[in-house]
Amino acid sequence: MIIFVMKKIFFITPVQIILLSFLLFNCQAQQTTNASLEEAKKAIAASNEIYFQAFAKGDSSIFIDRYAKDCWIMPPNAPTLCGVDAPHEFFKTAYNKFGLRNGKFITVDVFGDGVEFVTEEGFWQSFDADNKLFDNGKFLVLWKKTPDGWKMFRDSFSSDRNK
C-alpha cells in the first residue's frame, strides 16, 4: 500500500497494517474495559451504601440481595458458608449472636476487567445498637456480574482484634 503525505511517499507493509489495526483495536478494548470497570465500581459503591441498612432495620432481605446465589462467605474463625442460604445464615449470626446493627466499608481499590468479575479490597467496621465500634478488619470481595447485577461471589474478611 502506498500513502502520499505532503508530497512524500510512504510504503506500508502488510505487517505494519496488522500492527496498526491491533493497536487501534487494543485501545478500543481498553476503553470498553475501563467503562465496564467504572460501571462495576458504581454498582459496588451503591451496594455497599445499603449493605449495613439490613442490620439497622433488622431486614435480612436487604443483606441477602447483596450476594450471588452461589456465594461463599468466609468469616474469621468460622466455617465457610456456601450457597443460596449462606447470606441468611450469616445475617442471623451477626445480628443475633454479635449484635451487629450498623457498619462501614472503606473501599481501597476495585480492580479487574469489569466484564465478569472484579475484586474489591478494603477495611470494615462493625457497630452495636449503641453505635459503639466492637470490631474492625479488612476484606477481599470477588464480585460477579449476574443477570441481577453485580453481586458478592466470594466474601472473605478478617478481624484486626483478638478473638
Predicted feature residues:
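Short beta-strand edge/turn micro-motifs at domain boundaries
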Residues: 136-161
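Surface-exposed, charged secondary-structure patches
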Residues: 89-129
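A mature extracytoplasmic/lumenal domain signature
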Residues: 67, 77, 122-124, 156
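Bacterial Sec-dependent N-terminal signal peptides
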Residues: 1-35
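Hydrophobic pocket/interface hotspot
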Residues: 51, 59, 63-64, 71, ...
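Short, low-complexity N-terminal intrinsically disordered segments enriched in polar/charged residues
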Residues: 13, 27-65, 69
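Solvent-exposed, non-transmembrane alpha-helical starts
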Residues: 131-133
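A short gly/proline-enriched turn/hairpin at secondary-structure junctions
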Residues: 66, 71-82, 93-98
